[in-house]
């Protein structure tokens, strides 16, 4: 399953607020569809599937990518759910979003893909790069690159930069100083349900 490129508000009507996907809020409260979906008791599978979809759409990853992250999270010490969230939070496109370089994760991914972002002084155009402690993420020293970011950083998609990331706003630079704490994950998600969803599939 590839990355979603359809209407974003349609997704948020179904799954709720996804700060990484869009800052806009739908004026319609009913689920998408001709008459909205009939309200009925959902199965445990449907609930787990919905939590998994929240993760996919918020971080903008494909199903195949998410499966890889789940496998990697399982192989690490500690809680699989927390490990999974940290892997997604450490993606370069998400770090740029949390720094305010892009208004959304898709917008931040575009900055990375188009070569406007450097990591440790070198241009890096891999949105899924896993940022690690000590990495310095900057906007390229070009007028066009800086112009793309300056408007976003004044009105970031999320109000607060997490404490594990140090932002130097005038220099358009951020530094990773550790791991993201669970409480600073901006998405309302039950990651344990996502782990349960994949327990028999992966």
Swiss-Prot record:
GO molecular function: rRNA binding; structural constituent of ribosome
Coiled coil: none
UniProt keyword terms in alphabetical order: Ribonucleoprotein, Ribosomal protein, RNA-binding, rRNA-binding
CDD domains for this protein: S4
Keyword Ribonucleoprotein attached: yes
GO biological process: ribosomal small subunit biogenesis; translation
InterPro entries for the chain: Ribosomal_uS4, Ribosomal_uS4_bac-type, Ribosomal_uS4_CS, Ribosomal_uS4_N, S4_RNA-bd, S4_RNA-bd_sf
Superkingdom in the source lineage: Bacteria
Any one of the GO CC terms: small ribosomal subunit
A Pfam family hit: S4
Span list, region Disordered: 1-42
PANTHER family referenced in this protein's UniProt entry, alphabetically: 30S 40S RIBOSOMAL PROTEIN, SMALL RIBOSOMAL SUBUNIT PROTEIN US4M
Function text: One of the primary rRNA binding proteins, it binds directly to 16S rRNA where it nucleates assembly of the body of the 30S subunit. With S5 and S12 plays an important role in translational accuracy.
The name this protein goes by in its record: Small ribosomal subunit protein uS4
Source organism of this protein record: Prochlorococcus marinus (strain MIT 9515)
